[in-house]
Curated annotation (Swiss-Prot):
A Gene Ontology biological process term: response to salt stress
Protein name: Shaggy-related protein kinase epsilon
Assigned protein family: Belongs to the protein kinase superfamily. CMGC Ser/Thr protein kinase family. GSK-3 subfamily.
Enzyme Commission identifier(s): 2.7.11.1
Lineage, uppermost ranks: Eukaryota, Viridiplantae, Streptophyta, Embryophyta, Tracheophyta
Species of origin: Arabidopsis thaliana
Catalytic activity, as annotated: L-seryl-[protein] + ATP = O-phospho-L-seryl-[protein] + ADP + H(+); L-threonyl-[protein] + ATP = O-phospho-L-threonyl-[protein] + ADP + H(+)
Length: 410
C-alpha cells in the first residue's frame, strides 16, 4: 500500500515559503479523511485533515513497470469551483511549484467513475489533462474520487463577462480563437475517441489569458454514445441545450455538442446568451423566436413522438438581423450552420474548423492584439485526422504549418 498522509503547513515551511495561503476555507466535510488505496489505479491518497487551506496532502504515485514510486505533496489553497458534483480546489505541488486543480467528487462504490474512465482516454492540447487521481473517505465512510488536473486560470465565461460588463464587444480575433479551439476539441473527442461531452458551455471552457489557448474541461456528463442505446435527455445546461434534448430525445448523437458550440459562438458575438430560456418550454420558445417553427420533417429528426404536436407558426428571424451590423458575415454563416434543427444537417466539428470564418487564424502573419504569436492551432495528431479527405486536409493545415504534421504526405 502506498504511504499517504498530511502534514501541517509549518512542518513544510522550507518547501513552501513562496506558496500563497488563502484565507478561504474548504468545506469541513472533506477535512476528515481516511486512507483509501485503489489497487487498480496504483495511486493512493489522502489521510487526515488534508484539504483545509494551507494543509499539505501527501500522496504516492507511480510504481508501474518497475519504476520507483514517487511521493508528491500538495498544499490546498482555495476553492475555484463548486456544484452538485462536489468541489474543485486549487493546490500547489510543493516538489515542483506547479499549480494544479483537484476535482473532488462523491463516488458511488458500486460503479466505476465514468469521468475518470473518459479522462484516461483523452490526450489533446485543447482538452484539460489528467495528471493522476486518488480516492479518499470521510468518517461517514463516503468515498470521494480526487482528479488532479492541470490548472488553467480563466474561463471563456469570465472573459466574455469582462467585456460585456465594460459594454465592449469581445475582439473578433478572440472569438475566432476560442471557437476554433472548441471545435478542434470536439472534433477530437467526437471523431478520435467517440465521446460526447454533453455540457458544452462557456464555464466549461478554460482559457489561458496570456496565450489564449482554450481547454475543454468537466467531463462529468460525458459519455460514449452507442447507436441504439438510450441516453438521458435531461443533460446539458439550459441555454446550450439542443432542441432534441428539450423534446426528450434519448437516441441523440454528438451533434448536441455542436448545437452547444453554436450557442457559445453566438454568445461571444452578442455579449449575452442567444437563447436565455427560464425553463425547458421557455427555452424552446426562445429557439423558435429565432429559427422559426420547426417543420414536421425537422421535428421528426429531433423526436418522432412530437410530429403531431401543434406549434405556434412563427417565421424564422434572419440571422444577420440578430447580430450587430459589424459582425463578420462569415461568423453569422457559421452560427447558422451549427444551429440547425435537424441534427444531421449541423456541420461536424471538423467541417466547422475549415470554415472561412477561421481563415485569419491560418494566415502566418496573424498575431494576438499584443503582438504575440497565436497559441498552437495546427499540431494535429493522426487520431484527429483519421478519415479526413485530402481536400479537407489541404484546407485544414496551412502551408507554413505542414512541418507540425510530418506524418501526413501532403
Amino acid at each position: 500500500m502506498a504511504s499517504v498522509g498530511t502534514l501541517p503547513a509549518s512542518s513544510m515551511a522550507t518547501k513552501q515559503s513562496n506558496a500563497s495561503i488563502c484565507a478561504e476555507k474548504l468545506p469541513e466535510g472533506i477535512n476528515e479523511m481516511k486512507i483509501k488505496d485503489d489497487k487498480e489505479m496504483e495511486a493512493a491518497v489522502v489521510d487526515g485533515n488534508g484539504t483545509e487551506t494551507g494543509h499539505i496532502i501527501v500522496t504516492t504515485i507511480g510504481g508501474k513497470n518497475g519504476q520507483p514510486k514517487q511521493t508528491i505533496s500538495y498544499m490546498a489553497e482555495r476553492i475555484v469551483g463548486q456544484g452538485s458534483f462536489g468541489i474543485v480546489f486549487q493546490a500547489k505541488c510543493l516538489e515542483t511549484g506547479e499549480t494544479v486543480a483537484i476535482k473532488k467528487v462523491l463516488q458511488d462504490k458500486r460503479y466505476k467513475n465514468r469521468e475518470l474512465q473518459t479522462m484516461r482516454l483523452l490526450d489533446h492540447p485543447n482538452v484539460v489533462s489528467l495528471k493522476h487521481c486518488f480516492f479518499s473517505t470521510t468518517e461517514k465512510d463516503e468515498l470521494y474520487l480526487n482528479l488532479v488536473l492541470e490548472y488553467v486560470p480563466e474561463t471563456v465565461y469570465r472573459v466574455s463577462k469582462h467585456y460585456s460588463r465594460a459594454n465592449q464587444r469581445m475582439p473578433i480575433i478572440y472569438v475566432k480563437l476560442y471557437t476554433y479551439q472548441i471545435c478542434r476539441a470536439l472534433a477530437y473527442i467526437h471523431g478520435g475517441v467517440g465521446v460526447c461531452h454533453r455540457d458544452i458551455k462557456p464555464q466549461n471552457l478554460l482559457v489561458n489569458p496570456h496565450t489564449h489557448q482554450v481547454k475543454l474541461c468537466d467531463f462529468g456528463s460525458a459519455k460514449v454514445l452507442v447507436k441504439g442505446e438510450p441516453n438521458i435527455s435531461y443533460i446539458c445546461s439550459r441555454y446550450y441545450r439542443a432542441p432534441e434534448l428539450i423534446f426528450g430525445a434519448t437516441e441523440y448523437t454528438t451533434t448536441i455538442d455542436i448545437w452547444s458550440a453554436g450557442c457559445v459562438l453566438a454568445e461571444l458575438l452578442l455579449g449575452q446568451p442567444l437563447f436565455p430560456g427560464e425553463s425547458g418550454v421557455d427555452q424552446l420558445v426562445e429557439i423558435i423566436k429565432v429559427l422559426g417553427t420547426p417543420t414536421r420533417e425537422e421535428i421528426k429528426c429531433m423526436n418522432p413522438n412530437y410530429t403531431e404536436f401543434k406549434f405556434p407558426q412563427i417565421k424564422a428571424h434572419p440571422w444577420h438581423k440578430i447580430f450587430h451590423k459589424r459582425t463578420p458575415p462569415e461568423a453569422v454563416d457559421l452560427v447558422s450552420r451549427l444551429l440547425q434543427y435537424s441534427p444531421n444537417l449541423r456541420s461536424t466539428a471538423m467541417e466547422a474548423i475549415v470554415h472561412p470564418f477561421f481563415d485569419e487564424l491560418r494566415d502566418p502573419n496573424t498575431r494576438l492584439p499584443n503582438g504575440r504569436a497565436l497559441p498552437p492551432l495546427f499540431n494535429f495528431k493522426p487520431q484527429e485526422l483519421k478519415g479526413a479527405s485530402l481536400e479537407l486536409l489541404s484546407k485544414l493545415i496551412p502551408d507554413h504549418a505542414r512541418k507540425q504534421c510530418s506524418f501526413l504526405a501532403l
